[in-house]
Amino acid sequence: MKIVPPRGMQDFLPHEKEHRDRITEVIYKSYISHGFNPIETPSLENIERLACGVGQENEKLTYKIIRRGLTGAQTVQHPDELIDLGLRFDLTIPLVRFWNTNRARLPKIFRSLQIGHVWRAEKPQKGRRRQFIQCDIDIIGQPEILAEIELLVATLSTLEQLGIRTPKLHINDRRILFSMLNNLGVPHSCHVYVSIVLDKLRKIGLDLVKQELCEFPALVAYLASSVNSNTGSTDLCFDVSSTKDITHIRRTIQSALPHGCKFDCEDLCRIIASVNEFTQTGVFFDPLLVRGMGYYTGPIFEILHDDYSIAGGGRYDGLVERLGGLPTPACGFSIGFERVLGLIKESVSLDPKKMILLYDPKVDPNLVVSVKLEFISKGFIVRPELASRSRRNQIELAKREGFGAFLYLDPLSPPDGLLAKVKPIL
């Protein structure tokens, strides 16, 4: 029997879990300060909701749950009815279901905060596991661009608190993307397929993308002239971080689009100007930015660090209605926790109120518990540990876990005055 976790999943040692919890706490407190309300949704959703077509490629990666109580004959005769549930592959679809279920008890404009696990049955690689954490904020019921501005400013502020100070914000609009595809001869019926292929540009490279899109020669020619074939990065990422002048931003966006491609980009220009007003982040208009989910309908954005995506989101106005609710505007942003974690060096600071209680084997167990409870009442974190012959090694190991103090308890230790005998770990 294998003793390792399933492929693409991971155990975390105590010090690793503490490090992850510290980062989660920073994200949580930052988003709370921006007025977002924490919620929790189930890990499982009905399969018809997860497979409704809005998740695009991620729907193929859904972990599916076989219905309980089926007989062998049912399993063979009705294979399509085997599955009724699946593990969520993102937090947005569960959020929309949550909104449709609880709408009457929620504010008209609802600011949601979710931090939780999601699952995708994909090939594990660096920075990509089958079980991972997403940190999502969403605003449901707000049609104005204030939603996008709030989400962007809150997320960039949170990343700064985590010590990530040089991210780049890439921004586009799904409507600009589709207008550009129309201009390049891609029929409306092929927009979703072409978007899926373009979204894989960084992963599979220009040559493979050109092969998959060979039936659209104008688009292939546009890509060949604007994409670095070695890196998959686009030469059309126009820097719009140096100005709050909406007219200048509008001209920059129009100059990035193919000749003859026109679109009202006023909202996008105002969003960019506002981000420049409130943050020092580099902002780039990227006409080839897609974002993988099929539910996006308007502005879309992605935050990169060293050309590595660490967060992304956008507006998805049609999703609430598509999943059974009333027409409702919505917009969201998600931090990829595992990717952000990789940018933050784990550091251990010694806590003087975190104490290891070393006790002699002859000490009465009731005394150990009594001393432990006494120090807990004084605000200490206490871990009893049987003293070994090499107490120095024990203390050194405790130090690596952030313990900043220790106390040695022997049978002759007086019950009073123990606080004065606590020694710092240096």
Swiss-Prot record:
GO terms for cellular component: cytoplasm. It catalyses: tRNA(His) + L-histidine + ATP = L-histidyl-tRNA(His) + AMP + diphosphate + H(+). Gene3D superfamilies: Bira Bifunctional Protein, Domain 2 (3.30.930.10). CDD domains: HisRS-like_core. It is found in: Cytoplasm. Keywords: Aminoacyl-tRNA synthetase, ATP-binding, Cytoplasm, Ligase, Nucleotide-binding, Protein biosynthesis. It comes from the Bacteria. The keyword Kinase does not apply. Pfam families: tRNA-synt_His. Belongs to the class-II aminoacyl-tRNA synthetase family. Homodimer. This is Probable histidine--tRNA ligase. It comes from Tropheryma whipplei (strain Twist). The gene is hisS.
